[in-house]
Amino acid sequence: AEAVEDLGFSHLFRSDHLTGIYGHPERASLALWPSLTALAMRTKRIRFGPMVCAVTFRHPVMVAKMAASVDQLSGGRLDLGLGAGWNDMEHKMFGVNYPRYGVRLEMLDEAATVIKSIWSGEPVTFTGNYYQLEEAQSHPGPAQPNPTLIMGGKGEKTLKIVAKHATEWNFSYGGVDLFREKSRELDQNCAAINRDPGDIRRSMMAPFVIGRDEAAAQSRIDAHRRMFSSLPATLAEWNEAGFIGGSPSRVIDQMKAFTAAGIDRFMLQHNDLDDIDSLTLLATEVLPHV
């Protein structure tokens, strides 16, 4: 976290998991909210948050309370990513209920309503299919009036929920053409509920590798695949999957293409936490040009 701040990055996000994923439960996985509290204490400038907090893991009132508390402790630097949950094996391992996808989307819709209502500081009565509140209020609220609420996804129902609730839509795992298509769909969903599409920021999340040249970038892919074997094997396959990777000039070209299509910010997944050299190269050779 301190390296990210010192290098000039704007944000640092954490995933929300109960165990190591992708077939490696033996790997360390710090609990989300305590680690964000520590991050708040160890940094001064960067914004941060979960990407994303799964609604299947916690009641939305608890999410609202923890998010508001961390926002207070950090002086208003929290962005909240909220999602429907996705890792079925993780839920099964710990006996956490994992409803079908349509139900999880309904839970996400209700959870976003509950969280924003609790943040208002006013008494809230809410009767949904999954959550019920009666004159509920919780103080203190967030330090910032309306923390950024980030939602991801590309599905038809998901994009309607994004249009209804989110202040930022996160696109992932796809190319420029797919982003344009889904961004237009989101615009249409906003128009259907009389919301200005410009109110919703567009961001992109993707795995990334970078090297001084493409051979060095390929070496980093090889290292990442030793941790996550499902990742693409070659730099060409990496880029075809919509991932960001290559030499600094190649990464700049990829990011500029997405920026021209409407991406406002990039969330680059850094799988090797000990690899500060890649972050330094990204900060010095890429960020000044995008």
Language-model-detected regions and their locations in the chain:
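Active-site-adjacent structural elements that line small-molecule/cofactor binding pockets in enzymes
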Residues: A1-V290
